[in-house]
């Protein structure tokens, strides 16, 4: 604290030498009033009156013994209770001590596995997907895609032009077998189960294309067209499915499907000349 110059005559008349009257306290009923004097930051003398409420309570023996300890050091002459020069009385904080068993029960309640853990894949709600009220509706995009894929696959299998039997490539129409259009030219690639996906974004990668078509059915080959200089996607790709019905399902499901803020266009791959 800064030292302030006071008149010695005033100090003698007031019967104190530090420029401040002595503190006093008195008890009235259940309240104790403590009056103190001090200098503020502006050098002015201020009077501070603190009020304490006296309450009688039963405390543990350890607390009672601790309160009866003899003060030491610079506080050895202080009166019982807190000293305003060394202790600041703040608001009372209530603490509750619980045992280890109660602590474990509290944590088990907070870590309830049935709360705030489940997340629905359909509507992103806080419940399991099997209990979603929108399951099977238009919001269930996975169910809708599976329905379209199954319908397209069934239509491809029920095509009367297909017998369902295995036909070697050289025996197919236009193949390299006897009587075929390409007899003597060598083996030609089969594009009957290939689809062309266009209107792709420039940031499209092979991993994204794999993620897009892997749920429809197995595929044998993929080709993503890229620019030679920049390496960015040209906007189209080819996917060769293992089965023709999966290719038909891909057209039914992905054609007109929104992906990366663009509407995809999926169609049968045209034979290369």
Swiss-Prot record:
Q: Where is the RRM domain?
A: 193-271
Subcellular location per UniProt equals: Cytoplasm
GO biological process terms, alphabetically, are: formation of cytoplasmic translation initiation complex
**Gly residues: which segments have biased composition?**
173-183
SUPFAM superfamilies membership: RNA-binding domain, RBD
Keywords linked to the UniProt accession: Cytoplasm, Initiation factor, Protein biosynthesis, RNA-binding
Instruction: List the residue ranges of the region (Disordered).
Output: 165-193
Q: Name one Pfam family in it.
A: eIF3g
**One Gene Ontology term of the molecular function aspect:** RNA binding
InterPro entries cross-referenced by the UniProt entry: eIF3_g, eIF3g_N, eIF3G_RRM, Nucleotide-bd_a/b_plait_sf, RBD_domain_sf, RRM_dom
Query: GO CC terms for this protein?
Result: eukaryotic 43S preinitiation complex; eukaryotic 48S preinitiation complex; eukaryotic translation initiation factor 3 complex
Database matches in Gene3D superfamilies: 3.30.70.330
Give the PANTHER family listed for this entry. Answer: EUKARYOTIC TRANSLATION INITIATION FACTOR 3 SUBUNIT G (PTHR10352)
Q: Which family does it belong to?
A: Belongs to the eIF-3 subunit G family.
What does this gene product do? RNA-binding component of the eukaryotic translation initiation factor 3 (eIF-3) complex, which is involved in protein synthesis of a specialized repertoire of mRNAs and, together with other initiation factors, stimulates binding of mRNA and methionyl-tRNAi to the 40S ribosome. The eIF-3 complex specifically targets and initiates translation of a subset of mRNAs involved in cell proliferation. This subunit can bind 18S rRNA.
Give the record's subunit note: Component of the eukaryotic translation initiation factor 3 (eIF-3) complex. The eIF-3 complex interacts with pix.
Q: Kindly provide the name given to this protein in its UniProt entry.
A: Eukaryotic translation initiation factor 3 subunit G-2
User: Where does this protein come from, organism-wise?
Assistant: Drosophila yakuba (Fruit fly)
């Amino acid at each position: 604290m800064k030292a302030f110059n006071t008149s010695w005559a005033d100090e003698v008349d007031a019967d104190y030498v530090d420029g401040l009257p002595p503190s006093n306290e008195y008890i009235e009923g259940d309240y104790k009033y403590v009056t103190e004097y001090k200098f503020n930051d502006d050098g002015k003398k201020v009077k501070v009156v603190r009020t304490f409420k006296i309450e009688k309570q039963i405390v543990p023996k350890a607390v009672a013994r601790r309160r009866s300890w003899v003060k030491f050091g610079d506080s050895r002459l202080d009166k019982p209770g807190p000293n305003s020069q060394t202790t600041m009385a703040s608001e009372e904080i209530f603490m509750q001590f619980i045992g280890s068993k109660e602590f474990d029960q509290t944590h088990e309640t907070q870590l309830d596995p049935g709360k705030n853990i489940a997340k629905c894949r359909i509507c992103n709600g806080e419940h399991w997907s099997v209990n979603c009220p929108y399951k099977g509706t238009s919001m269930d995009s996975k169910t809708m895609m599976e329905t379209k894929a199954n319908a397209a696959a069934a239509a491809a299998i029920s095509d009367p032009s297909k017998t369902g039997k295995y036909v070697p490539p050289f025996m197919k129409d236009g193949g390299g077998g006897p009587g075929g259009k390409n007899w003597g030219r060598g083996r030609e690639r089969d594009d009957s189960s290939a689809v062309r996906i266009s209107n792709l974004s420039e940031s499209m990668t092979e991993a994204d294309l794999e993620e897009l078509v892997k749920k429809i059915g197995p595929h044998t080959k993929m080709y993503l067209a890229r620019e030679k200089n920049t390496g960015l996607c040209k906007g189209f790709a080819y996917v060769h499915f293992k089965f023709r019905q999966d290719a038909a399902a891909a057209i039914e499901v992905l054609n007109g499907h929104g992906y990366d803020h663009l509407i995809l266009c999926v169609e049968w791959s045209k034979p290369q000349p």
